[in-house]
């Protein structure tokens, strides 16, 4: 057919001639209350049934049948995201007027100009880490990169991401025209500005958010080295923290950025040398800062 699945799949069962209940494939965790997968359900597959995408990107039938599939074109990208541990992604329902294009399970974003986009998770505490690989169209301060940001936003009731964010980027307005800097719009905290050039295409930016104490902090890393921070952010009335994606204005060419929230990929390219991660949740290019973990459902429940 000419219709294509635009998303991620895991543990795909087709039970030919049978109508099973959801409880045959999943159950409620007695400790956390989460709905969790039954990795080996007791079901029958009939003649034409199959079970693919079990614990990876294999389309070889894992049922007693041999109804194997082949990939007609391209590649199936493996992801750590699965029914038992859902990782953060961007939310296509939480966008501005110019949404750009979301790809690779809503982790890659391409846009020429327009608004921000939110994510599906917004924790109220904890220590979190994610990475973003700068893609095409980012050449440094100047008209072609006006107004792009990435960082974290501490949400308050009836506020948008632009109200209480701490972000790294280039601003083309006010008295800091086309200045690469950290911008703190949270109403509190102090900034350690970067003394490096704007990240060029290919740079992997690590972002670490600490909401574990009475105040919060955001730190930025270029290829594993810390380059700037905002510390001492008060958050007593924050409802949660979300990822700040880029927000472009102007008439520049298409620009892109690829996020790794722990899936181990930037777009369709796997990390080249995974860093250490004490929590063992997620795969990142560089070492995860002490005490931090991936923004995922297992991390939220720790």
Predicted regions and their residues:
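Extracellular glycan-interaction patches encoded by glycine-rich segments
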Residues: 1-9, 249
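Short hydrophobic/aromatic patches on beta-strands that form ligand-binding or substrate-lining surfaces
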Residues: 9-13, 52-53, 61, 130-134, ...
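Short, solvent-exposed beta-strand-to-loop segments that form ligand-recognition rims
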Residues: 35, 222-245
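Secreted extracellular polysaccharide-interacting domains
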Residues: 98-123, 189-194
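Short, aromatic/His-centered strand-loop micro-motif at the edge of beta-sheets
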Residues: 182-204
């Amino acid at each position: 057919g000419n219709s294509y699945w635009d998303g991620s799949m895991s543990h795909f069962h087709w039970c030919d001639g049978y109508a099973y209940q959801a409880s045959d494939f999943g159950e409620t965790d007695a400790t956390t209350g989460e709905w969790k997968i039954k990795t080996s359900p007791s079901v029958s597959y009939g003649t034409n049934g199959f079970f693919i995408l079990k614990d990876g990107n294999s389309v070889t039938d894992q049922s007693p049948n041999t109804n194997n599939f082949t990939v007609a074109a391209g590649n199936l990208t493996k992801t750590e995201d699965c029914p038992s541990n859902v990782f953060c992604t961007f939310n296509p329902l939480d966008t501005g007027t110019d949404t750009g294009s979301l790809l690779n399970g809503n982790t890659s974003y391409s846009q020429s100009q327009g608004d921000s986009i939110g994510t599906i998770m917004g924790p109220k505490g904890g220590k979190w880490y994610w990475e973003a690989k700068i893609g095409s169209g980012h050449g440094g301060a100047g008209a072609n990169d006006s107004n792009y940001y990435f960082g974290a936003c501490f949400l308050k009731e009836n506020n948008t991401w632009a109200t209480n964010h701490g972000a790294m980027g280039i601003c083309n307005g006010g008295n800091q025209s086309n200045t690469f800097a950290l911008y703190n719009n949270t109403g509190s905290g102090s900034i350690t500005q970067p003394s490096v050039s704007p990240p060029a295409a290919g740079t992997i930016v690590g972002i670490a958010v600490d909401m574990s104490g009475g105040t919060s902090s955001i730190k930025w890393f270029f290829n594993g080295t810390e380059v700037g921070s905002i510390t001492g952010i008060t958050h007593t009335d924050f409802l949660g923290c979300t990822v700040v994606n880029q927000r472009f204005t102007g008439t520049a060419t298409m620009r892109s950025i690829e996020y790794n929230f722990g899936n181990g990929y930037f777009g369709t390219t796997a990390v080249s040398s995974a860093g250490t991660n004490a929590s063992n949740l997620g795969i990142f290019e560089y070492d995860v800062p002490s005490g931090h973990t991936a923004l995922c459902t297992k991390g939220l429940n720790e």
